[in-house]
């Protein structure tokens, strides 16, 4: 039986190489952020405007403490090399995780993850409420200040570039040190990057926004990987999609905080809130056990047994390992392009890129395009389209979990492509028919969010345990890549493309995705993860 090294401490399935180093790092990061608060308070009498102020000594010391804290906490989480190179095929029955009934432990995990997702999504959501105040304080160029020199969109670009980097970085990290440990490290990142609220210069705000994006972009994919490996197969699909729908709660909470706090404490308070929410995030992680599947794949049977017992799974050993099918899967990025997974990786990559181009292209430019065409009620139209489409989220969850995951993706992608081609055909004349405008808008406004949610769940199901975090990270990163291109157009002052142009840019990859899913997609509905992997190996043989 695999024994743990004596110098390793464990907490609910998380392996700490040095527990003292980890918690020392958390304290250092928190203290470093607190050292920035006096700088923020110095601006109280001038509306908390810090632009142009020099950094004081406590801030510089605090920044050093944060850097050291990040290094120390990662060292505390990083497992010994022997734990990451195990090729032992555990004989513990993995099927027991899917045979277990949905218990209060599962419900607790789902609720905790819903809160975690809300905290995570609050970060990029806050950007919309931060931009007006930051634009005025730093004299940035935007519709609020057309005479500015530096485009305000640089902030959004740095953030989304960070999310792309974070998706791939955390994808690697999640497969290296574990799902829960990676989520915990993202929480520490939330704490540290909250100093953005005390940065006096716009350049430092850009740097902090990039780092914040890295933490945000990495956490969500790992959450989906953990849920996929923990929730019983018969409930996995629909429950995970509903967790993704919790994003709406983040928008509501952030808008409420902005309304209540920004008029008094300025836009900076929305970044500084990252300190208490980040600490809460770390504390919540105590109720998120490590993935038993990840532990078994690492040969850490003793820890896996404890996690399985927590979820009511009967721990039974079998003569032949159910994980043997994954024994030849290498823990590296190149596996995503291997013969067994190339087809599904093409599906994920194309669908992610297409959804990103629609989300950050069509949906980003549609308010501007409608106003250019004289439609002064564009904001109300977009809001109404989103509200009309929201109830359909529950229909999608049912379809994915009880009808067919593959057919659901094909249907959503087809509807999105058809609606976008409708805009291509009708063009600017669409504003002359309000009923047609609403009909065409509902799908890309609501539907693309459903596509992103379904893609996140699907990518967590189709890759084996050894590379599951990389797979979900790849899906998340590819979906943001389109956003990088579209927001860059704003930064460099390129005129807004027409409705027909941005619709065509999104319609082409969405149409291609339909064919890729049809030919290379694999059905995941109510199927065990190991069964899905075995099917992929059989198809590639």
Stretches with model-predicted labels:
Residues 181-195, 408-422:
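Structural signature of the two symmetry-related core transmembrane helices
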Residues 198-208, 263-266, 425-439:
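Helix-loop junctions at membrane interfaces in 12-TM secondary transporters
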Residues 235-265, 272-281, 476-486:
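Glycine-rich segments within core transmembrane alpha-helices of 12-TM secondary carriers
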Residues 125, 159-168, 251-252, 389-394, ...:
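Residue-level signature of mid-helix packing/kink "hotspots" within the transmembrane helices
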Residues 36, 115, 121-132, 337-394:
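Extracytoplasmic gate region of multi-pass secondary transporters
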Residues 167-178, 392-405:
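Helix-to-loop junctions at the C-terminal end of transmembrane segments
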Residues 48-56, 130-164:
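Extracellular/periplasmic helix-loop-helix junction of adjacent transmembrane segments
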Residues 1-9, 41-45, 62-99, 287-341, ...:
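Intracellular cytosolic loops and amphipathic helices of Major Facilitator Superfamily
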């Amino acid at each position: 039986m695999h024994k743990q090294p004596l110098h390793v401490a464990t907490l609910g399935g998380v392996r700490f190489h040095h527990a003292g180093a980890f918690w020392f790092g958390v304290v250092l990061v928190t203290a470093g952020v607190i050292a920035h608060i006096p700088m923020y308070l110095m601006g109280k009498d001038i509306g908390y405007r810090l632009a142009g102020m020099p950094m004081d000594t406590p801030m510089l010391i605090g920044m050093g403490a944060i850097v050291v804290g990040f290094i120390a906490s990662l060292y505390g989480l990083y497992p010994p090399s022997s734990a990451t190179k195990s090729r032992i095929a555990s004989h513990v029955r993995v099927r027991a995780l899917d045979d277990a009934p949905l218990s209060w432990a599962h419900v607790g995990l789902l609720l905790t993850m819903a809160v975690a997702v809300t905290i995570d999504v609050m970060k990029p959501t806050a950007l919309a409420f931060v931009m007006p105040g930051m634009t005025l304080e730093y004299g940035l160029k935007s519709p609020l200040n057309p005479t500015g020199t530096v485009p305000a969109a640089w902030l959004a670009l740095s953030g989304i570039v960070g999310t792309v980097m974070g998706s791939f970085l955390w994808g690697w990290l999640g497969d290296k040190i574990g799902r829960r440990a990676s989520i915990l490290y993202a929480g520490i990142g939330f704490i540290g990057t909250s100093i953005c609220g005390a940065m006096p210069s716009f350049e430092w705000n850009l740097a902090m926004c990039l780092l914040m994006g890295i933490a945000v972009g990495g956490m969500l994919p790992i959450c989906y990987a953990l849920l996929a490996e923990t929730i019983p197969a018969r409930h996995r699909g629909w429950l995970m999609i509903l967790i993704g729908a919790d994003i709406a709660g983040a928008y509501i909470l952030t808008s409420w905080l902005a309304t209540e706090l920004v008029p008094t404490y300025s836009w900076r308070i929305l970044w500084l809130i990252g300190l208490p929410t980040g600490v809460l995030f770390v504390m919540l992680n105590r109720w998120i056990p490590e993935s038993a599947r990840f532990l078994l794949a690492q040969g850490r049977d003793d820890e896996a047994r404890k996690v399985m017992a927590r979820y009511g799974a009967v721990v039974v050993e079998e003569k032949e390992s159910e994980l043997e099918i994954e024994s030849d899967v290498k823990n590296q990025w190149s596996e995503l392009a291997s013969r067994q997974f190339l087809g599904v990786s093409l599906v994920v990559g194309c669908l992610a890129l297409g959804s990103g181009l629609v989300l950050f292209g069509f949906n980003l430019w549609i308010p501007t395009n409608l106003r250019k065409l004289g439609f002064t009620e564009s904001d109300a139209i977009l809001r109404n389209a989103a509200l009309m489409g929201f109830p359909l989220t529950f229909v999608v969850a049912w379809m994915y979990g009880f009808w067919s995951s593959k057919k659901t993706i094909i249907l959503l992608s087809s509807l999105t492509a058809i609606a976008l081609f409708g805009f291509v055909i009708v063009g600017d004349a669409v504003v002359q028919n309000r009923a047609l405008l609403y009909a065409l808008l509902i799908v890309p406004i609501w539907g693309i969010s459903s596509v992103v949610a379904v893609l996140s769940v699907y990518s967590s199901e189709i890759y084996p345990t050894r590379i599951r975090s990389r797979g979900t990270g790849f899906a998340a990163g590819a979906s943001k890549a389109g956003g990088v291109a579209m927001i860059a157009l704003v930064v460099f002052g390129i005129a807004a493309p027409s409705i027909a142009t941005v619709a065509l840019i999104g319609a082409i990859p969405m149409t291609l995705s339909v064919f890729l899913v049809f030919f290379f997609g694999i059905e995941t509905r109510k199927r065990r993860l190991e069964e899905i992997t075995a099917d992929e190996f059989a198809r590639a043989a």
